C-alpha cells in the first residue's frame, strides 16, 4: 500500500511540475524576451484575421509583380547587371526607393534584383572620394543621369547598410559582391566624418539620433520616420565595427524620442523634429503629419515585432493612433493632418496633385499597427488593407512608387515575411 501511495505521490508531483512548466512556457510567450529575434516566430496577422494562406501568398506575389514586373512597375533593369527603382511621378531615382527595393529583394530572396540595384546605386550615386566619400547623392534623374543633389538623406544610408548586412547573412560574401565589405565601407567612412567640408556622421553623436541630413544645419535636427531602432539593433549585432554600444544607445534613444514626438492623444508626429521631439518647422512646409510620417507606424510595429523592448508604450501608441484614424472614418481618413488631428491649412503636393485623399500608403502602414494592438476591432484595419487596391484614384492620381512600396512592406509585415535575417552557414 505504501508503494502505491508513494507511486501516486510521484505521479501527482510529476503532473503538477509538468503543468507548471507548461504555464511557464505560455507566460514566456508573452514576455519581451519572446520577440521575433528570440523566438524566430513572426506572426501572420492575415491568417489570424481569417484569410487563407494560399490567398495571402497570392496577394503578396501579386503586389511584388505589380511593383517590380508589371506595366506600372517602378523597377527598371539596365543592361545585363544593373537596375533601379524610380519615383516615377517625380521623375527621379532616390536612395529611399533604391534601398527599399534592396530590402524587399533580400527579404523575398531575390538576389539578382538586389545585386542589380546595388550595382546601379554604387556606380551612379555613391561618392568615391572627397568629404562625402562612401555616402550617396540622394536623387538622380535616371534619363539624363544628372544628379539632382550631391547631398545625402540619412535614411538612404541607414537602409543601405541594413540591406547589405542582411544580404551578407543570407547569401554570404563570395557570390560576386562582398556585401559585408560594402556595408563596412559606408560605416567606416561615416565614423571618419568630423565636419570637414561640412559633412558629418549620419548620427548626431552628441544626441545619439539620426540626422535629417549629415551636412550643415541638417545635422542638428531629425525626421521621426528615420528612427528605426530595430535597424540599429541589427547594426549592433552584425556590423562588428567596434561601435556596437553606440548603436544600442541610439536604438534606445530613438524609442524615447518617439514617445516625445508622437502626440499624446492622436499619436500623430510631425514630418520633422528637433532632437527633443518637438516639431521642427522648415522653410518649405509648416509643421504637420504628411508623407514622411506615414512610415512611423510601420517602423514602430517592426520594432515591437522584432525586438519587443518598448512594448508597453508601443501598445498604447497603436491604440491611440488607430482610435484617431477610426474617428475620421476607417474607409475615409485623409492623409495629412495637424498634430491635433485637425485639417492642415497647407497641403503638401504629390505628383502634380495638391489635395487630401484616403491614401493607400497610410492605409497600409496603419494596418501594421495591428501587429501591436490586440483589441479585436484592430483587425478592421487589416481587412481595410486586404480590400485596398494599388490602382489609380478617381482623379487619375497614381503612385505605385511610394503608395506601392509601403503597401508591399505592409503586406510583408502582416504576413510574417519581413524578418531579421540572421547569419547563416554558407
Residue ranges and their predicted role:
Residues 1-8:
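Bacterial N-terminal signal peptides that target proteins for export
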Residues 12-20:
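Hydrophobic h-region of N-terminal signal peptides that target proteins for export
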Residues 21-27:
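Sec-dependent signal peptide cleavage junction
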Residues 27-62, 91-95, 130-135, 149-155, ...:
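Extended ligand-binding clefts on enzyme/binding-domain cores
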Residues 37-157, 163, 293, 362-372, ...:
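N-terminal carbohydrate-binding/catalytic regions of secreted carbohydrate-active enzymes
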Residues 63, 108, 121-124, 128, ...:
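Alpha-helical solenoid scaffolds that mediate protein-protein interactions
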Residues 104, 163, 167-170, 186, ...:
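Core register positions within helices of long alpha-helical scaffolds
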Residues 342-426:
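C-terminal functional modules
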